[in-house]
Amino acid sequence: LPPQHDAPPLEMAYVVRFFWPLALIMAVQSGTRPLINIFVARAVDGTEALAVLTIVYALGHIPYGWLNEVRNLPTAFREANNLAKVRRFIFGCGAFSFVWMAAIVWTPAADYILQNWVGISPELAMHCLIPLSIFCGFPIVVSLRSYIHGIGLLQHRTQAMAPSAPSRVATVILVLSALSDTDLHGATRATIALLSGHTVETLVVWWSIRRGGKEIEVTEV
């Protein structure tokens, strides 16, 4: 980038204001699954559900986990004529991840992988199938969230992203509480709660960024 001689000096207070919402979001994202595990472990089928979740988290994260990194693209390619292309690329990545996951979990390949590659029992594999199917929703939600996060970073509006973190925790707790008296398997309840938390988090950050009514501003380089 060319030097910007007229740019004001960076102040530490501004860095703190910019970073603390990101730190909060990262902390909540890291703590959501342990929080869910605490709820699940207290159920009657807690031990089995935790075993299922350990497998589901590991396998389900493979097709979509990398989508979190595309949030860096709007800032990396921030010229005005690039943003639409970046948006299409991100959503294309989300569609690719969804097809990848669906091709595995909605076909007999899932049962084969669970029993022959992972090496778990047929009964445990059966309990993994529904949670893995629910995980097919994550590529769409995560790709949209990553794009919105990228816009927030581009516009330096990270404080608008902060409310999404507590909304995710609240949603997870509410959904787990609402499903606690159902006959659903513990791992299924946990996966529904996790996807619900991601979805509400994405909606809240979209609303927060959009609420400012600020057009997407880009810097010419």
Residue ranges and their predicted role:
Residues 57-60, 93-96, 164-171, 193-201:
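Transmembrane alpha-helical core residues of multi-pass small-molecule transporters
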Residues 50-103, 145-156, 160:
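Small-residue-rich hydrophobic transmembrane alpha-helices
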Residues 1-30, 211-221:
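Interhelical loop/hinge segments that connect adjacent transmembrane helices in multipass membrane
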Residues 11-19, 54, 124, 128:
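Primarily residues marking transmembrane-helix entry/exit sites
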Residues 99-129:
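Short membrane-interface helical motifs at transmembrane helix boundaries
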Residues 16, 20-76, 100, 135-142:
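Transmembrane helix-bundle signature of multi-pass secondary active exporters and lipid flippases
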Residues 135-140, 149-176:
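A late C-terminal transmembrane helix in Major Facilitator Superfamily
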